[in-house]
Amino acid sequence: MDDKSYYEEIESILRQILQPIEKISFSTFIRVVSGYKIIPIDLSKKEDKELINDLAKACNEVIEEIKKTGGVKTKEGKTPKRVNEVGNHIEHYVKDVLNKYGYAITPKTKKGKQKSTGYPDIEFWYKGKKERDGRVVYIEIKTFNEKNINSSHRTFYASPSKDEEGVKIRYDAPHLCLSFKIEKLGRDYYATGFKIIDLSKLKGGIKREFNASNRELYKKDLIIYEKDLK
């Protein structure tokens, strides 16, 4: 193979690799990036039905707790400035309530280090009082409203960790999304409903992208002209 054919083949392969992947199951994605399986929920099983019933009770309690605080508040008691921040601040309500039904923590990596960023939001030991006590369930917190529930915009993200030690999944387990319906009343945001979603059945896409940091973008050898008005 001559150099021209070689580079043409490399370019062709890269072009195919960089194409978005459509309709991949979340279960497959999680198994590839973590090595662990998503266990589907089967409501014909007593233990699964009991789990979902208790999570539904917990979601109702979260809604009531939000009412008591006069809408969703940060841990410091402030109202989120933007609606897309609300989901982040519902998490502490959810953790507090889930601790009545088990043991809820920020997920740990394989090295045992807690990591708040990335998927999933919560590692929940159902009916347990500590780690490895009870049944483990991974939980992601989301929000929605009547206007955006049928939107085609991407709202659910999970990215592979740069290294295997950064993955926040350590067990085969159910993966559930607790999504709260949000309505704005005055300046405050209230939860007025919820959905419990079995992520084992979710299908989505993988979109590759090129990215660079500011440090990489603004290197001196890249800049061909600049001006700074002082």
From Swiss-Prot:
BP-aspect Gene Ontology terms: DNA restriction-modification system
Keyword Nuclease among UniProt keywords: yes
Source organism superkingdom: Archaea
Keywords for the protein's UniProt record, in alphabetical order: DNA-binding, Endonuclease, Hydrolase, Nuclease, Restriction system
GO MF terms held by the record: DNA binding; type II site-specific deoxyribonuclease activity
Reaction(s) catalysed by this chain's protein: Endonucleolytic cleavage of DNA to give specific double-stranded fragments with terminal 5'-phosphates
EC id: 3.1.21.4
General function of this protein: A P subtype restriction enzyme that recognizes the double-stranded sequence 5'-GTAC-3'; the cleavage site is unknown.
Name of the protein in question: Type II restriction enzyme MjaV
Lineage: Archaea, Methanobacteriati, Methanobacteriota, Methanomada group, Methanococci
Gene (UniProt): mjaVR
